A protein has these predicted regions:
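Short helix-initiation/N-cap motifs at beta->coil->alpha
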Residues: 84-96, 179-194
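Extended ligand-binding regions for polar small-molecule ligands
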Residues: 67-77, 139-143, 147-161, 206-207, ...
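Acidic, polar ligand-binding/catalytic clefts
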Residues: 71, 75, 79-148, 204-227, ...
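Extracytoplasmic small-molecule ligand-binding "clamshell" domains
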Residues: 30, 34-109, 292, 297, ...
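Bilobed "Venus flytrap"/periplasmic-binding protein-like clamshell domains
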Residues: 43-52, 62-77, 111, 131-183, ...
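Bacterial N-terminal signal peptides that target proteins for export
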Residues: 2-16
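C-terminal functional modules
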Residues: 288-345
Length: 345
């Protein structure tokens, strides 16, 4: 019996050793950052067209807040913000396209939720825009609050948290309504414009953008009610922690740059600074780039290419844009908002 046990143990150990040696001999799967470097460009998923976030002009040039984030990531890697391909995705396509590897990064006004992380195997790399769901009506409806939307027809994009929030809010307030769900945001807007429904619900930032597409924007009113928290941010697959960490810190770098007063126009001064926190940011001290798999100048390259968070916001969404959305919660924590980034240390 004892000899049999010893033989079994020796056999088991031999098998384990063989498997270990075989595994060690297999080539390591390339991470997303290595794949992007080898390809020579970043594949970034964006919306099909949302003013302020991602839109393509007649010449095929992309612009917007989400688009600029992709360019910041490309600049951090390649020192060239043009080394990115934009892949337009609908709400129903976006997460599956990311999971399938059709894009490296999703920067597409997507809300961070538990279900999306836990069930879909995705990781949200922080928040780039704190939003909330609202309602747009035609002035002829005369409502002044979402609580006055009883017996209305409401257009909503299917397969979104917006659709779920709508049901929760109206049922909890005993409001009867007819939901009109559409596969795309464009279809929902078209139905609202044609009068098939008299209410359109989306994130408030999107409603500001959609109103500009109407023949007479002044005829539409965005109600003051905000019925949800919609933390929007870039998304990666959860099977590549190194890539997730890189994308997350590109996000944080833009916020930290605003706090430090580093802009797209003063990077030369930042590089000559003697302040320890600025020197760490520009890569003159510390080995933070190496920790991310790139060189130490990654953060300053991103800011030089697209600007700090304030520059991104004001150019695409704020006072310098067509939308004119106040920063509100998206102001720095030191300025009355909740925008906050960990230190680069």
């Amino acid at each position: 019996m004892l000899n049999a046990a010893k033989t079994y143990i020796r056999s088991t150990l031999a098998c384990f050793a063989a498997v270990t040696l075989w595994a060690a001999a297999q080539p390591a799967a390339a991470g997303t950052l290595d794949t992007v470097k080898q390809r020579g460009s970043l594949q970034c998923g964006v919306s099909e067209g949302l003013i302020g976030f991602s839109e393509k002009d007649a010449q095929g040039a992309w612009s917007g807040f989400d688009v600029d984030f992709c360019r910041a990531a490309a600049a951090a890697i390649f020192d060239d913000p043009t080394k990115v391909s934009f892949v337009p995705l609908s709400a129903s396509q976006r997460f599956e396209a990311l999971r399938a590897g059709q894009v490296d990064l999703l920067s597409r006004n997507s809300s961070w939720t538990l279900g999306r992380e836990a069930e879909l195997g995705l990781s949200f790399a922080g928040v780039t825009y704190h939003d909330g769901q609202g309602f747009m009506i035609m002035k002829s409806l005369t409502a002044t609050s979402a609580l006055e939307l009883d017996r209305t027809k409401i257009c909503v994009e299917a397969g979104t948290t917006t659709q779920l929030n709508l049901s929760d809010f109206l049922r909890s307030n005993s409001i009867t309504y007819e939901e009109r769900a559409f596969p795309t945001a464009a279809a929902a807007l078209a139905a609202f414009q044609s009068g098939d429904c008299n209410v359109l619900t989306r994130d408030q930032s999107a409603l500001y953008a959609e109103r500009l597409k109407l023949p007479r924007p002044a005829d539409a009113v965005i109600l003051p009610d905000v019925i949800s928290k919609e933390p929007l941010g870039p998304v990666t697959r959860s099977d590549d922690f190194a890539w997730f960490t890189f994308v997350k810190w590109v996000n944080f770098a833009l916020v930290n740059a605003e706090e430090l007063g580093i802009t797209s126009t003063n990077t030369a001064e930042a590089l000559a600074s003697t302040k320890p926190d600025v020197r760490r940011f520009v890569g003159a001290e510390g080995g933070f780039g190496k920790m991310l798999g790139i060189d130490n100048a990654w953060a300053i390259r991103a800011v030089k290419a697209v600007g700090n968070y304030s520059e991104l916001y004001e150019r695409n969404l704020g006072v310098k844009s067509r939308l004119g959305i106040p920063r509100g919660l998206n102001q720095l924590w030191s300025m009355g908002g909740i925008l906050y980034a960990p230190p680069l240390r």
